């Protein structure tokens, strides 16, 4: 698996860093707190180590497929710098925020011309969307949308509805 921005925030919290605890993180921490005391510390250490060991992205099928949480530009594929890891986790932002307080993101996929297909998510959309050999499969399961997967190499999209709404989106995506 590849890490997402929320995974890395949880890892930082488990390592004792000061992070802003939002609803999703609060839920995760509350679930961890239900563990018996004799298992909690070991679990937190093991979880933090697992998350810390994840790579930012995968280059698969002899370079024909890239999987990253928020995307991956062609020139970054297969590299492991902090800049590459940040792009894989967050994409690229303008430095501005929208009317909902969320970062305004550059549409990196609109300029993508790489040879590998890139599968990513991070920014929920109503339907999976192919653009320039990239596909965003984040169809907002956490917000009551769909959980979507891409079968490769068939390029078959499979979506199943969320069982429930786990969180309310900061801005509508449907």
Question: Where are the model-predicted features located?
Answer:
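Histidine-centered divalent metal-coordination motifs
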Residues: 5-6, 69, 119-124
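Short aromatic-enriched loop/helix-cap "lid" or pocket-rim segments at secondary-structure transitions
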Residues: 12-16, 77-81, 172
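Active-site neighborhood of divalent metal-dependent phosphoester bond hydrolases
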Residues: 1-61, 85-100
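Active-site-proximal beta-strand elements of phosphoester/diester hydrolases
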Residues: 65-71, 135-137
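Active-site beta-strand termini and strand-to-loop segments that position acidic
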Residues: 60-62, 152-153
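Divalent-metal (Mg2+/Mn2+/Ca2+)-assisted nucleotide/phosphate chemistry catalytic cores
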Residues: 72-73, 79-87
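Short catalytic/ligand-binding loop motif for oxyanion handling, primarily in non-cytosolic enzymes
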Residues: 9-12, 67-68, 74-77, 126-129, ...
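Acidic, His/Gly-rich catalytic cores of divalent-metal-dependent hydrolytic chemistry
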Residues: 83-174
